[in-house]
């Protein structure tokens, strides 16, 4: 972790992020990264839900070190691996902006909300901390996105419901609770916050068409 930073994970930034999607800079925020190396001697400490700090193992994790990799760069590694959830999200973008579908990650930035490796596939409320929200705001100030797409319901209280920077919660029903806006100190423009189900959930498919419709509005794209 860098000095005076709440953030552990370094966001992935696509090479055309500044160009964006239809001229809008888009930051995608997932829930958490998990570790399944249960036999690793570092596992219990690295994924401790009490400590919530994987940084001591950033460059010494046995699994990552043998590949010359660092834990903090997991957002980039996850994009390179193109896990099923990421493929499903790309499918959504395909439905919205067809010409960008094959290389959508080149045009967006990505990170996860929780700032340590969790010990389970699912993200639970007790994994979250104030540090994660501080890291989220830190990332917004750094990347200055026009749009934030937040995956999942576990983080929604932090990202939206209890977020003091949301300026128009009263208008959420107008978009069936998909769209609101943030005004963060240090950023001149307001940020559109788009909250949807996590691509790994069954609700993702059940809500797919409606989600695509509102996402199309957010990026001002017309088929």
Residue ranges and their predicted role:
Residues 1-81, 132-135, 139, 178-186, ...:
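Active-site and ligand/interface coordination hotspots across diverse enzymes
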Residues 31-36, 114-118, 153-157, 198-202:
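Short, solvent-exposed loop/turn segments at secondary-structure junctions
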Residues 76-99:
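Signature of the catalytic double-stranded beta-helix
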Residues 21-26, 97, 101-107, 181-194:
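Beta-strand-turn-beta hairpins that frame and shape the catalytic cleft
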Residues 123-137, 156-223:
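C-terminal capping/extension of enzyme domains
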Residues 65-84, 113-129, 198:
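Surface-exposed cleft-lining segments at the edges of enzyme active sites
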Residues 136-153:
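Proline-aspartate-enriched helix->loop->beta-strand connector
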Residues 27-28, 110, 147-150, 195:
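Structural recognition of the beta-strand scaffold that forms the well-ordered cores
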């Amino acid at each position: 972790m860098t000095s005076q930073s709440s953030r552990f994970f370094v966001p992935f930034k696509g090479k055309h992020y500044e160009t964006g999607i239809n001229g809008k800079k888009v930051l995608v925020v997932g829930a958490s990264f998990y570790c399944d190396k249960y036999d690793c001697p570092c596992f219990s400490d690295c994924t401790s839900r009490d400590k919530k700090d994987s940084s001591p193992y950033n460059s010494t994790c046995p699994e990552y070190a043998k590949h010359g990799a660092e834990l903090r760069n997991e957002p980039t590694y996850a994009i390179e691996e193109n896990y099923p959830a990421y493929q499903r999200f790309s499918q959504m973008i395909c439905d919205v902006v067809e010409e960008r579908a094959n290389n959508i990650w080149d045009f967006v930035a990505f990170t996860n909300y929780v700032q340590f490796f969790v010990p389970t596939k699912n993200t639970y409320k007790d994994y979250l901390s104030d540090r994660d929200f501080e890291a989220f705001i830190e990332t917004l100030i750094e990347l200055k996105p026009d749009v934030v797409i937040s995956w999942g319901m576990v983080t929604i209280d932090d990202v939206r419901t209890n977020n003091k920077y949301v300026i128009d919660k009263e208008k959420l029903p107008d978009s069936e609770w998909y769209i609101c806006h943030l005004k963060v100190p240090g950023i001149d423009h307001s940020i559109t916050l788009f909250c949807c189900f996590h691509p790994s959930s069954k609700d993702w498919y059940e809500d797919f068409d409606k989600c695509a419709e509102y996402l199309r509005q957010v990026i001002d794209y017309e088929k």
